Amino acid sequence: MAEIKNYSLNFGPQHPAAHGVLRLVLELDGEVVQRADPHIGLLHRATEKLAESKTYIQSLPYMDRLDYVSMMCNEHAYCLAIEKLLGIEVPIRAQYIRVMYSEITRIMNHLMWLGSSGNDAGSSTTLIYTFREREDLMDMYEAVSGARMHAAYFRPGGVYRDLPDTMPQYKASKVRNARSVEIMNRNRHGSLLDFIDDFTQRFPKCADEYETLLTDNRIWKQRNVDIGVVTAERAMNLGLTGPMLRASGVAWDMRKSQPYEVYDRMDFDVPVGKTGDCYDRYLVRVAEMRQSNRIIKQCVDWLRANPGPVIVDNHKIAPPPREGMKSNMEELIHHFKLFTEGFRVPEGEAYAAIEHPKGEFGIYIVSDGANKPYRLKIRPPGFANLSAMDELCRGHMLADAVMVLSTLDIVFGDVDR
């Protein structure tokens, strides 16, 4: 009798469900996965090495391009590490703005994940729903930085500028008539804070719509329940963080466990799962979006009542205001030297970590006292999460590997760095 052998299959890197450039070598027994071997490095851009030849400010835009779905969160960790080395205190208003935009970014990330995960399971409607709200969030990015994705808005010592008093508005064109423009601009006539406040009031109903589509949908449950189960103990041993860890029942959240900025002033809950399967990871992320919405609302209320500076008043670290540059030679010199030579950071090393939408995102900087880092190390959450892929897929069907990969929430910009 002929011996039946397992066969290998390449999944990706061009597969639409590979979430980037993942090459997954699967060993299959029929349609059952016996081994899953992730091959990474296809998006390696040497970010850590490039940072060694750039000033601290010049490296900031690289952070946006790591996890390019959670841009400002990457900047946040980088700025915190530099500020720890410099020993500076960020103005309280800037801290609130940072926290607010970190939570806006968290919702952006989870909406992208939810839409693409639903799409992977065959529910393309979910993608249309989530991108509807994501458009408003990207407009919030554009209002403060001029960019919808790679904002470079957080700076060492604060943020680039204060929140604007107006919102960009749509204009009639060949593809948009006056009626559609009026509908699109209906909540854009006030300030940015008014626009964000309006979003926080609308969003809970939108989250209800996502749950109506998926939570009790029998096909969605068949694709996710008891798939890719990881216990709490095993999740910690694997180094999983973020929703991957919390879905297994471990209430570990850097915003609560090791609060940074003004998270200790915020009132929010940490959603945790029970069984640690794909379905729990879905429920945790949807609940996280609701909690992020609560935090954003608290930040909006505080920012409305408390004006103030948004960056440190030290022109060796932060650029002077443009109005002053045009009338004061000293401020012009500060600006010129800051953007040509950068600023020197005291010798030492610092690690700063934040609760990134995907888990613990850390930046480790070693300084030799120069204007460039001697060594920059990035701790991406996706790298540890992806390492569990083999264990989570074993014994499941080939189609289930797609859902396991989806609930890991992998973006290869930060995995490959």
UniProtKB/Swiss-Prot annotation:
Signal peptide: none annotated. It is found in: Cell inner membrane. It catalyses: a quinone + NADH + 5 H(+)(in) = a quinol + NAD(+) + 4 H(+)(out). Its EC number is 7.1.1.-. The keyword Transport applies. Keywords: Cell inner membrane, Cell membrane, Membrane, NAD, Quinone, Translocase, Transport, Ubiquinone. Belongs to the complex I 49 kDa subunit family. NDH-1 is composed of 14 different subunits. Subunits NuoB, C, D, E, F, and G constitute the peripheral sector of the complex. NDH-1 shuttles electrons from NADH, via FMN and iron-sulfur (Fe-S) centers, to quinones in the respiratory chain. The immediate electron acceptor for the enzyme in this species is believed to be ubiquinone. Couples the redox reaction to proton translocation (for every two electrons transferred, four hydrogen ions are translocated across the cytoplasmic membrane), and thus conserves the redox energy in a proton gradient. This is NADH-quinone oxidoreductase subunit D. The lineage of its organism: Bacteria, Pseudomonadati, Pseudomonadota, Betaproteobacteria, Burkholderiales. The gene is nuoD.
